[in-house]
Amino acid sequence: MKRMLISFCLAAASAAIAGGSANYPVNAMNRMLEVECAKRGITIIDYHVHIRGGMTPELAAEREKAWIVRSSAMDNHGREWDTKNDSQLLRFAEKAKAVSDRMPVGIQVNDRDWFRQISPSTREKLDFILADTMIMGKRADGRDNRLWQPQTIDDPEKWMKEYFAHNMRILDEPISILANPTYLPMELADRYDSLWTDERMRKLIEKAVKKGVALEIQAGSPYPRPRFLLMAKQMGAKFSFGTNNFDSKPKDLARWLEVITWLDLQASDIWTPACLKK
């Protein structure tokens, strides 16, 4: 019944979001999310708020004043991104923290040697570090191979072995959140069940739990699929929430509501950064 009601609310939510405000609209679906979170004692923090496309720390701070979903401010770090070094990262963190001392500030790391590029003292200034698995290897021109762009994959199983090892290496990095877990490029999306076997899922979840890395539930993403989510909860994983915005427009949060209710998530299932435990 709840799933049917959530589906019924989607059209209204999409229409309200199209209005252009940076704040989340007051609609039936968002009211349901608010009720479910209150009932379960869950505080939702969006840890995947990119400062780009018109989104600013100021808008993020204003957004969280308007509704129950709290915001963060996150910069991208890497050789092919604007923020490449400690001084640039510190400037970003200081500016964001000056806007709101209650808003977690972090980065998305895109180079796999990022922890050698960023000094430990700079890392200590951050509240969280997020990574995804969607950049793997280099293209022929030497630039990062971004898996959301068209790929040529001749041998899916061979590619998957390499990609799974890539996932496990990222979990060995000192990160806080693994974003969009079990992602696959569009060329392999229809092979999800055969490529993401139970064994691979179990090993990934085991390492995430061991390392204390949260698994993201991303608004608008089909990943991870229900089989992974159920296994992750049963194995004691912690979850986080993210939107992965491209601009300042609020995203449809139906995915969050669906997973919270389907998995019967409680406050104890949700990851919290050290800065909010004080």
Language model features by range: what are they?
Residues 48, 129, 180, 215, ...:
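Conserved, mostly hydrophobic/aromatic
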Residues 1-4:
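Positively charged n-region of N-terminal signal peptides that target proteins for export
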Residues 24, 30-161, 247-250:
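A metal-dependent hydrolase metal-coordination microenvironment
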Residues 9-18:
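Hydrophobic h-region of N-terminal signal peptides that target proteins for export
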Residues 67-68, 125, 173-177, 264-266:
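Short loop/turn motifs at secondary-structure junctions
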Residues 21-42, 192-278:
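Charged catalytic cores and adjacent phosphate/nucleic-acid-binding surfaces used
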Residues 59-62, 90-97, 119, 167-168, ...:
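Short amphipathic alpha-helical segments and helix-helix/interface helices
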Residues 132-136, 143-235:
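Domain-core and long-helix interface of multi-subunit machines
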